[in-house]
Amino acid sequence: MEILQFIGYGNMAQAILEGAHEILSKRFILEITGRNPEKIAPFLQEKNIQAQIVPYKDAIDIHQKFVFLLFKPYNLKDFNYQGQAKSVLSALAGVGFKALSDAIDSLHYLKCMPNIASKFALSSTAVCEKSPMPLISQKALSVIESFGNCVRVGHEELVDASVATNGSALAFLSLVANSLKDAGIREGLNARGSLELVKMSFKGFAKLLEKERPEMIIEQICTPKGATIEGLSVLEKKGVRGAFIEACHKSVKKMRL
C-alpha cells in the first residue's frame, strides 16, 4: 500500500484528517511528521484516526511517498528532505512549482487550496498540476477529492487566486453570518434563536446556489417596493459588494507577496 505523508499538524491538517481519514486509510498508510508531530497525538486519539507519528530528526524520508505539505509557507526550507517523492501535494499559499521543486525532489507536483470545511468533506479545492503523470495524478487527485470537490485550474497562479472564492471566503462569510445573527438580536430575537435561523438560511442558500445563479436568487426574493429590495439598496449604497471584491483582492495580493 502507498504511503501518504502529512508534513504539518495544524488546523488544516487536522480538518483534512477528520473529514477524509476513513477514505484515505483504505488507500494509503498514513504518516504524520513535522517539527513536533507528537502534538497531534491527542487529536488522533480523540477522532480515532489511525496514523503513524514519525518524529523529525535530521531529515524527512519522502522516498516513493505521496507527500502533503500542510505547514506555514515560510517553513518550506526549514526541513531536510531525503529521497524522491512520488508526488508532492502542496497547500502552501504563494509557493510556486519552482520553489517546491528546488526544495523537494518529486516525480509529480500538485498545488491546491483547501479550506477548513475539509473536516466535513465539503472543501472546494482549486488544484493545478505540474507535468501530470496519469497513474500518479489519479492517486494525488483522489486525495484531494477525499475531503471535498476538486476544481482544476490552468495555471498555478489561479490556485492562489482561489483564496478569494474558497479560502478566505469562509472567514468573510462568517462575518456575514455574525452580522445577520446580530441583526436578528437587534430586532428582538434571542441569540440562540437568531443563530439557528441564520444557520438554516445558509443551508437553504447553499441548496439554491446549486441550481441558481446568485442574481436569479435575488430576483426571486425581491418584490416591487418590498422589504428585501429596501435592504439591498442600503447594502449597495454602503458599497458592500465592492468591499467584498476589494477584501478578496487584498487577501490574494497579500498571499502573493
UniProtKB/Swiss-Prot annotation:
Annotated S-S bridges: none
Concerning SUPFAM superfamilies, the annotation shows: 6-phosphogluconate dehydrogenase C-terminal domain-like, NAD(P)-binding Rossmann-fold domains
| E.C. number(s) listed in UniProt | 1.5.1.2
Pathway linked to the protein: Amino-acid biosynthesis; L-proline biosynthesis; L-proline from L-glutamate 5-semialdehyde: step 1/1
Query: Which key words tag this protein in UniProt?
Result: Amino-acid biosynthesis, Cytoplasm, NADP, Oxidoreductase, Proline biosynthesis
Any one GO MF term held by the record is:
pyrroline-5-carboxylate reductase activity
Q: Which GO terms describe its biological process?
A: L-proline biosynthetic process
Catalysed reaction, written as an equation:
L-proline + NADP(+) = (S)-1-pyrroline-5-carboxylate + NADPH + 2 H(+); L-proline + NAD(+) = (S)-1-pyrroline-5-carboxylate + NADH + 2 H(+)
Subcellular localization, as worded in the UniProt entry: Cytoplasm
Q: What is its main location?
A: cytoplasm
Which Gene Ontology cellular component terms are annotated? cytoplasm
This protein's source sits in the domain of life called Bacteria
InterPro entries (alphabetical): 6-PGluconate_DH-like_C_sf, NAD(P)-bd_dom_sf, P5C_Rdtase_cat_N, P5CR-like_CS, P5CR_dimer, Pyrroline-COOH_reductase
Q: Main EC class of this protein? A: oxidoreductase
Instruction: Report the Pfam families cross-referenced here.
Output: F420_oxidored (PF03807), P5CR_dimer (PF14748)
HAMAP family, per the entry: P5C_reductase (MF_01925)
The free-text function statement in the UniProt record for this protein reads:
Catalyzes the reduction of 1-pyrroline-5-carboxylate (PCA) to L-proline.
| Family indicated by similarity | Belongs to the pyrroline-5-carboxylate reductase family.
- Name-wise, this protein is Pyrroline-5-carboxylate reductase
The taxonomic lineage of its organism, from the top, reads: Bacteria, Pseudomonadati, Campylobacterota, Epsilonproteobacteria, Campylobacterales
